[in-house]
Amino acid sequence: MDESHGLQEDRLIWMFTQMLRIREFEERVKRSFAEHPGLLRGHTHLADGAEASIVGSLTALRPGDQILTTYRCHGYPIVLGTDPRAMMAEIFGKRTGLCGGYGGSMHLTDVERGFLGTSGIVGQGIPQATGAAYAAQIAKRNQVILCFFGDGASKQGAFHESLNIASLWRLPIVYVLENNSYNVLTRVEQEDANAAAGEPLSVKARAYSMPGVTVDGGDPVAVYGEVSAAAARARAGNGPTLVESKIYRLSAHGNIIVPPEIPLHFPEHEAIEVFGAVEEYEAAKRGDPVPRFRARLIADGVLAAEQADAIAGDVRQEMAGAIDFGANSPFPEPADAVKFVYA
């Protein structure tokens, strides 16, 4: 591989496997929403198209590092080692879920593995992650925090307040801005002055005297290179970095279950049905990061096609088991509703 950033072949294969696991998990969730209305409850946001960005970023972590993410959160704990059966049970609202059925799709957490949680409110995980970095600095834990958020969150006041204080205090944090070009039904150029001017969103770092870089979020090795460099800088006491990872979500903004009498329509993708950008969407699908990385590993002799197929088969079996576990687990008892109520 031309630019492996020191990653060994077994690590590259591991990264490919994690990308497959995220994709298969999300495909199982998507199919369950479509084929079994009422089986899954509430709202879910899928990460298909973001697998390379997620895996590349998390590969840069060391044991003890921590992350916070957005509500589009399923992929991160999978990579960190969380049991996908517990995750699927949580999305099903079951007692055996990762959070006992209390959190659902948008509020996952696994503190033991460094996953501090998510935020259902756009941008509000950013100050929480900044606070975690401040705590790590005070405790001298030699720990780095990764904070993930989208392009829409970079317009929130919490984003600017957090970057200011993180730069001022040289906090050990890396801000990973996953720019998927759409904030629900709004293109990034319609709401972001930098994007409208043809600038990368990473230029926002300049206002806070911190480095800002933009990377192809469809290339997990390139993402790893930028995030690992930023993490090393943070760990050395040199403060935060803003990394813009340019991705393209391949599904609609979200999936939601509504009663059939409510006339709501959810598009396949906003690029097609709102903007008519069919070629843009088709080009994004042709650049899908999962088959793209598979082809790269095969071309570089890291992986044989038969090996890749065998890995994919194992992943399908694993996620089929996760769906079965989630569907067949028990619901919480009525008394569980007040289990964690203290006042």
Give the predicted meaning of each segment:
Residues M1-R41, D48, Y281, R292, ...:
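Cofactor-/ligand-binding subdomain signature composed of acidic, glycine-rich
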Residues I22, P63, D314-G321, A343:
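A short structural micro-motif
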Residues E24-R31, P37-W169, Q190-S202, A207-S209:
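Cofactor-binding active-site loop characterized by glycine-rich and histidine/acidic residues
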Residues A47, A312, F331:
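Conserved phosphate/pyrophosphate-binding and hydrolysis machinery centered on Walker-type P-loop NTPases
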Residues Y71, S245-I247, V341:
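A general secondary-structure junction signal
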Residues F115-D324, N328:
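Glycine-rich ThDP/TPP pyrophosphate-binding loop and its adjacent helix/strand module
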Residues N328-A343:
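C-terminal intrinsically disordered, low-complexity extensions immediately downstream
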